[in-house]
Each structure stands twice: as C-alpha cells, then as structure tokens.
Amino acid sequence: MISYLDNIVFLLAKGHQRAQGVLKGHLNAFGLTPMQCLFMESLWDEDGLSVGDIGRRISLDTATLAGVLDRMVTAGWVRREADPDDGRVTRVYLTDKAKGAFSDLSASIERTNNELLSNFSLEEKLLFKRFLRDVKD
C-alpha cells in the first residue's frame, strides 16, 4: 500500500493549503479572497463577461459564483448589468476601484507564485505548471 506521504491526493491537498494560505496573506490588504481575485483576473483578461463565461474560465458553476459576485458588487469591485441583447444574461464589469488595484494585485499574485516556487529552477517551474495543468485536465 502506498504511504499517505507519497499519495498524490494528499500532496496536492497540502500544496493547495499552503498556496491558498500564502495567497490569502498577500490579498488580506485588499480585503479579497483568492476566489474573488481569480474572478477579477478573468475580467482583467476580458471585461464584460457573462457570469457563465466567468464560470467556464475558472471552472466553477454559476450557482457557486452567485455569492462571490454578490459580495464583490457590495464591496465595489465589480458591477453587473443586463446584456443589452439578451436580458436573461448578466454581464460583469470591473469598477474603477478594481481597475486601479490591477497593478498592486498583479504584484501580489506574482509574489505568491515566486514565494511558492522559490526552490525551483526555471525548468522545474515550467514542468511543474505543465504537470498541474495535465492533472487538472
């Protein structure tokens, strides 16, 4: 039987816990959670996405995103509007607050990645990311 110390599920779970903890530490100053930051990152790539499009990009269902969206609207990070061509679709837009925080938030994400991967060579970083993408897919 494989030891839990070599069990990939255990290792991924512990790696995830550490990564989330480091990221939370960097995001505390903004009052954002890692999920909220990921939500905003999808809008930095393309502002005005529908809630469904955001969910597909970050691999979450719209029901899960509803609460995240509500909290982000309340905090002033995003605004929602009905799609002008289809009133059933809600589009989400970054506010000036979110756009103004882009540089600082990007730096926090980069610091998180650098901290987590500080013991890796460039080649190891590239391989690690590829392996994680393969496991995710």
Describe these PLM feature segments.
Residues 1-30, 94:
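N-terminal leader segment of winged-helix/HTH proteins
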Residues 20, 70-130:
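Charged, amphipathic alpha-helical coiled-coil/dimerization segments
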